[in-house]
């Protein structure tokens, strides 16, 4: 039973690290989007947006599986996911104002 608990703890730790890495990736892509790099083309920005969204989606999908990590670590990951989501929503609202106004 002790081995099973150790395995579960290690798996939870690895899952938390994976989620954190996905969020880091998402923040990296979002930073490029919000910096409005003058040399970045429209296709490039759409690719960064897609990758940031994918990173957030993957992290958000994995978060409910975090059962064995302490509440502080879980809370930190949830807050980071929320901040990334807000940044992406803000970018979308600014980059596609017509889409937002039309409710798409």
Question: Over which residues does each language-model region extend?
Answer:
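Short terminal alpha-helical segments
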Residues: 1-38
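Amphipathic alpha-helical binding modules
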Residues: 73-104
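Short, charged, amphipathic alpha-helical segments
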Residues: 43-54, 73-82
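Short, solvent-exposed, charged loop/turn and helix-capping segments
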Residues: 61-77
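Charged, low-complexity interaction regions
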Residues: 35-43, 67-71
């Amino acid at each position: 039973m002790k081995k099973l608990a150790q395995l579960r703890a290690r798996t939870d730790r690895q899952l938390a690290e994976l989620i954190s890495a996905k969020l880091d990736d998402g923040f990296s892509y979002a930073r490029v989007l919000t910096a409005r790099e003058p040399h970045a083309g429209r296709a490039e920005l759409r690719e960064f947006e897609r990758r940031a969204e994918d990173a957030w989606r993957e992290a958000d999908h994995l978060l409910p599986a975090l059962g064995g990590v302490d509440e502080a670590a879980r809370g930190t990951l949830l807050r980071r996911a929320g901040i990334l989501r807000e940044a992406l929503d803000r970018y979308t609202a600014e980059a596609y104002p017509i889409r937002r106004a039309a409710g798409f």
